[in-house]
Structures are given as C-alpha cells and as structure tokens.
C-alpha cells in the first residue's frame, strides 16, 4: 500500500515548518488571519487543544500506569537492541493510539463504563469524544513521521507512515466487520472471528513491532510480528473468557457485558455451532441486560463445552507463542527472559 505523493509532500512540509499540534507534542497551526482583537494567539491554540482533547486526557488519566503495551515494547527491544529514545517514541505512539481507539470503540460498542468509571462519551458527549479520538489518530501519525525524520530521514519516515497506514486500515476493517456482525445479527464462523482478532487486537501490537524495526540501525531482523499478533489474539480470547467468568471484570465493565453490547465472542460462537437449537441465539439477539437471562446463556455455553473449548484454545495459542519465542531467541535465553516473564503473568492458570 502506498501513501499518495501529495500527502507525503504535505507531511514533509509539516515536519519542516511545524504547523500541527496536539497533546502528542505536535505544534498546532496558528491563526492565519488576525484582526487585533486578541494578541494571545499562541495561548488561544493551546486552550483550544486542551478543550477539544478533554476526552482523550480523561482516558489517559483513567488508564495511567505502566501498561502491558509499554512493557511489551521493551521486551521486544531485548531482541533488537535499539536506542531507548526510539523505543520510548514508538511506545508513546502506541499508547496514544490505543487510548484514542478506546474513545471510538466505547461509542461504537455503546459501552457505559471504562475501568468502572463513566465512558468518555457518557461524560463529554459523543461528538466531542469522537472528534478527539480521530484527532489523535492523525497526531500520532505526525509523531511517527517526525520520529522517523529525526532518526533516519525521509526514507525511514515514509516507511513508518506507510506501516502506520496499513495497520490502521486493518484495525478499522476488523472493527468494522465486528460491528457488521453485531448489527446484522449475523454470527461469523470461528475462523472468521479469529481473523478479525488478528486485524483488530493483534494489529496494534504488530504495528509497534514493525515501527520499532524501522530504526536504521537495527541489526536483528527477528520475526517478532507473529509473536505480537498471537499475543493480541490471546488477549482478546482471554477477555472473552473472563467477561463471562471473572467477578473483577464484572465490577469494571458490568456482568457479561459482551452480551448486552451484542458482541459475538469465541465461547458464544463455539456454542452456537455445537448446538444451534439450544436457545442461545435467541437470548443473544435480545442483547440482554437481565442478569438471570445472562446466567442462562452462560449455562448453555457450559453445557456445550464452550468455556472448556475457550481454555483449550488459549492453551494452544500459548503453546504457539512458546514455540515462536524459542525459535527467535535460539540459545540466548537472556534475550527472551523479559518476554517470557510477561507471558507467564498473562496466561490463565491451567
């Protein structure tokens, strides 16, 4: 996939004159026309950004702390040996992109809560929240391009912008088809569902790895993308499971909230395939908020062996990950020690 030359020219010009900005550190365009009513135009731009990015700032504060994505990027760098400032730059881009995507996801999923607090659109409204999320998508692209220009010039910057665009397209394809399945009440096959997870959930981590490996001084061309992809898939399958089974998850998102949102998850799809006439589909189509009805649906999934099947699939992905990590590290166990510690904390106990 290629970014149009006219867009790349625009990006190059922006990198030179610094005419954009955001919370991500990119400079905002100053007003072109000034009529003398107010000479504090720099503060005007800053004030506007602060206002329009309030939903994003709210999530960044709500989700603060050393995230799994930050830890993972540093674990991957143990294989690559890249400068710390480069890893920090890529990690910040991934974190900002993740938080921005949550703003949009929570609107599209009609989620009322995020980490036990009101979702951003419940607090700031749909329009401002959506605009903030979309704005950060573009400011992150600018940050990625600037990082590439600063480190390796136009060739590296263009490669990073291309990779960012490719993965963002895949992410939106995954999110889009999940919404289509939900709104059309058309459950996908299990294979289709896993492919969607690769696009949507695995893609963000794969983006981070691909951006890291754009550094002009990278020597180790380890194929870490497959590892990143499977970690993302494992994360979502794990969420599918704990959404139905974990009381702490219920406290933060609501009991079996995936059902209320109308989502199809792996345990649901497995159960529908095993027993099409169990009554589960009729319950799911109601997008139930009633706890008793949700418990009935979970009981059906237990009867069809779907919760056990979910754990078995998680075990299979875990085995795949172990094999891929061993393949990339060779005999250098120290190289993969951080990643393996991370994975052990991620895995559901067998």
Curated annotation (Swiss-Prot):
Binds 2 Mg(2+) ions per subunit. Dimethylallyl diphosphate binds at residues 114, 200-201, 236, 243, 263. Isopentenyl diphosphate binds at residues 66, 69, 98, 115. It is an enzyme of class 2 (transferase). Mg(2+) 1 binds at residues 105, 109. It holds the Pfam family polyprenyl_synt. It catalyses: isopentenyl diphosphate + dimethylallyl diphosphate = (2E)-geranyl diphosphate + diphosphate; isopentenyl diphosphate + (2E)-geranyl diphosphate = (2E,6E)-farnesyl diphosphate + diphosphate; isopentenyl diphosphate + (2E,6E)-farnesyl diphosphate = (2E,6E,10E)-geranylgeranyl diphosphate + diphosphate. SUPFAM superfamilies: Terpenoid synthases. Its cofactor is Mg(2+). GO terms for biological process: antibiotic biosynthetic process; terpenoid biosynthetic process. The record marks 137 as: Important for determining product chain length. Keywords: Antibiotic biosynthesis, Isoprene biosynthesis, Magnesium, Metal-binding, Transferase. The keyword Glycoprotein does not apply. Induction: Expression is up-regulated during pleuromutilin production. The keyword Iron-sulfur does not apply. Geranylgeranyl pyrophosphate synthase; part of the gene cluster that mediates the biosynthesis of pleuromutilin, a tricyclic diterpene showing antibacterial properties. The geranylgeranyl diphosphate (GGPP) synthase catalyzes the first step in pleuromutilin biosynthesis. GGPP is then substrate of the premutilin synthase (PS) to yield premutilin. Premutilin synthase is a bifunctional enzyme composed of the fusion of a class II diterpene cyclase (DTC) and a class I diterpene synthase (DTS), with the corresponding domains and active sites containing characteristic aspartate-rich motifs. Belongs to the FPP/GGPP synthase family. This is Geranylgeranyl pyrophosphate synthase.
């Amino acid at each position: 996939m290629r970014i149009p030359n006219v867009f790349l020219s625009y990006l190059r010009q922006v990198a030179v004159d610094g005419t954009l900005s955001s919370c991500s550190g990119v400079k905002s365009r100053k007003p072109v026309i000034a009529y003398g009513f107010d000479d504090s135009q720099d503060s005007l731009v800053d004030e506007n950004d602060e206002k329009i990015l309030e939903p994003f700032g709210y999530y960044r504060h709500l989700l603060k702390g050393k995230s799994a994505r930050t830890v993972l990027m540093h674990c991957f760098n143990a294989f690559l040996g890249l400068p710390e400032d480069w890893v920090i730059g890529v990690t910040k881009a991934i974190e900002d992109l993740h938080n921005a995507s949550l703003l949009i996801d929570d609107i599209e999923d009609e989620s009322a809560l995020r980490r036990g607090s009101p979702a951003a659109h419940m607090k700031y409204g749909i329009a401002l929240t959506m605009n903030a999320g979309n704005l950060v998508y573009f400011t992150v692209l600018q940050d990625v391009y600037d990082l590439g220009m600063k480190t390796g010039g136009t060739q590296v910057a263009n490669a990073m912008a291309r990779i960012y665009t490719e993965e963002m397209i895949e992410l939106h394809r995954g999110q889009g088809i999940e919404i289509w399945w939900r709104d059309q009440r058309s459950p996908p096959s299990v294979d289709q569902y896993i492919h969607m997870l690769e696009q949507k959930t695995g893609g963000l981590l794969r983006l981070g790895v691909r951006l890291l490996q754009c550094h002009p001084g990278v020597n180790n061309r380890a194929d870490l993308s497959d590892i990143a992809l499977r970690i993302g898939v494992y994360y979502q399958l794990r969420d599918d499971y704990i959404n139905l089974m974990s009381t702490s998850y219920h406290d933060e998102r609501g009991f079996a909230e995936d059902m209320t949102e109308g989502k199809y998850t792996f345990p649901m799809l497995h159960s529908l395939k095993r027993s099409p006439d169990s009554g589960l589909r009729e319950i799911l189509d109601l997008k139930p908020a009633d706890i008793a009805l949700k418990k009935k649906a979970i009981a059906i999934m237990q009867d069809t062996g779907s919760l056990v099947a979910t754990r078995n699939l998680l075990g299979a992905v875990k085995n795949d990950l172990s094999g891929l990590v061993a393949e990339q590290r060779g005999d250098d166990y120290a190289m993969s020690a951080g990643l393996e510690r991370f994975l052990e904390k991620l895995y559901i106990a067998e």
